[in-house]
Amino acid sequence: TRLTRMDRAVHRHRARVGGLQAGGLGYRVISDGQASPRFTLRPAPGKGSGVRLLITSDHQAKPHTAANMELAAAMVGPVDAVIMPGDLVNSPDRAADWFGPHPSAGDDAEIRQFLPIMQGRARSTAANGRAYRGAPLVQNVPLYPAIGNHEVSGELGPSSCSIDSYRQITGARPWYAVTIGNVRLITLFVARMWRGFDVNADPRARQRSRYQEASADVGDPQRHGQGCFIHESIAPGSPQWQWLV
């Protein structure tokens, strides 16, 4: 499948593997004559069994994300799943935010985008001068993400990524529930339109948001306006609320 809602062509390949056994099934991916390392597919943990989950969020191509994921994976060892409550990337309709810099960026470019880090093929130099690669997680265990405000693009157009894009990929609503061993995961779409709470009289100098509270209301949350809102309603009677109850 070619995903057109990106700033460059992105292709998605999907395969279904059944009959997985407890010992796991080794696999590799071959594309354009290049073969990946060997990874492992395992069946879902049995209901009620103990599991080890890695919870992370707000990656957004930050300088130390690769180091954090590499060190966390080394410290906790093998996990059964990765849970991400939002903000996987910075700008969702930039392919580079998901897959890494364009090849034209050169061999020395920093690689600290979402998938390279979660696949252990990043190249991100931390403040200590050491280069970190992240960890090979999503090739071996499932990823359960939630949509954060950074996954919601602000402009709908022929080449922009939107909530519809995620539905096209998964075929599902942006909220879901799943059982992982002895854990019941309930994921809602409650991403919030973020706004700052600073006050600046000059609109051109407002770095975080063009909209702001009145000076007299900044210290009183009860008087704040509606510039900060949840993208998908969870009010009583809404589709998401009906599903949850």
Residue ranges and their predicted role:
Residues R12, A67-L71, W243:
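Well-ordered alpha-helical segments embedded in enzymatic catalytic cores
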Residues P45, S57, G86, I147, ...:
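Residues at the C-termini of beta-strands that transition into short coil/loop
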